[in-house]
Amino acid sequence: MLNFSDRLIESIKKKNSVLIAGIDTSIENIPDYFIKRFYDKEKSEIDNLKTILFEYIRRIIDAVEENVVGVKFQAAFFEQYSYHGFEVLHKLCEYTKNKKLVVIFDGKRNDISSSAKGYSNAYLGETPVFGKKMRFFEFDAITTNPYLGQDGIKPFVEDCERFKKGLFVLVKTSNPSSADFQDLMVEDKYLFEVVAEKVYEWGKNCIGKEGYSDVGAVVGATQPEAAKRIREILPNSFFLVPGIGVQGGKIEDLKYFVDSNNMGIIVNSSRDIIYAYKNYVHSDFEKSSYLASKNIKESINAAIS
């Protein structure tokens, strides 16, 4: 199997796109007409929830698949529905994988030692069960929080190497309060630069044939100045870039995120795609999501070409 970074590049070239569709879906934001279409009074509220959530997201994925290289599932929007949400997530992960799209679990997981290994087993690797190894999810990559240091990252990196998976470590995030910690000075460097240096170290042993590491960084689209500094530290790492659109990130600033080959980024768009029907005059949410993803893809390509 190819390394994660090589598979990602292969998909980028095939689709002529670096766009990732972010799935941050809550049941209350699904159109009423769609809920009425699938709501069955003979079923429980939980069964209706699972059916409607799956059917809506499945149709979003179908609508945008030609314009995106992958799908990023935000864990919180499934965890809010307890294990019922994770049943839906499991089905959607398999569904998306069958479409040959890159599948990212955005859970920002982290812990130490065996706890971190448990997270990595679940989402990247294998879990021991009665003397056998079982896979419960088939994600291609996961987001992680580096706050606990190497102890919390090592199990994920080891599974990236073993199973050809990917890792995106939070380095400089798009939220307004990211500066509270990430912009603190450590001697003569910002803390986010120190973290970027660690990301480089963690990823130097899992380099694909195309020369990119399977360990990348999350760098928010609202942080172009920081992105320049991080790119100097991580010349051969992919940046997962959230925050365009609603969060205030500008597509034209993406030129500061790419590497010297105008590569090295995948750009997430969530609400502008999954709730695009709110911005179009017609009520066809599938067509709206398709048009939104097409427009965003083309705008990104123009900005980084």
Curated annotation (Swiss-Prot):
It catalyses: orotidine 5'-phosphate + H(+) = UMP + CO2. This is Orotidine 5'-phosphate decarboxylase. The gene is pyrF. Disulfide bonds: none annotated. Keywords: Decarboxylase, Lyase, Pyrimidine biosynthesis. SMART domains: OMPdecase. It comes from Caldicellulosiruptor bescii (strain ATCC BAA-1888 / DSM 6725 / KCTC 15123 / Z-1320) (Anaerocellum thermophilum). The active site is at 108 (proton donor). InterPro entries: Aldolase_TIM, OMPdecase_type-2, OMPdeCOase_dom, RibuloseP-bd_barrel. Pathway: Pyrimidine metabolism; UMP biosynthesis via de novo pathway; UMP from orotate: step 2/2. Belongs to the OMP decarboxylase family. Type 2 subfamily. NCBIfam families: pyrF_sub2. Pfam families: OMPdecase. One of its GO terms (biological process) is 'de novo' pyrimidine nucleobase biosynthetic process. Signal peptide: none annotated. One of its GO terms (molecular function) is orotidine-5'-phosphate decarboxylase activity. PANTHER family: OROTIDINE 5'-PHOSPHATE DECARBOXYLASE. CDD domains: OMP_decarboxylase_like (cd04725). Its EC number is 4.1.1.23.
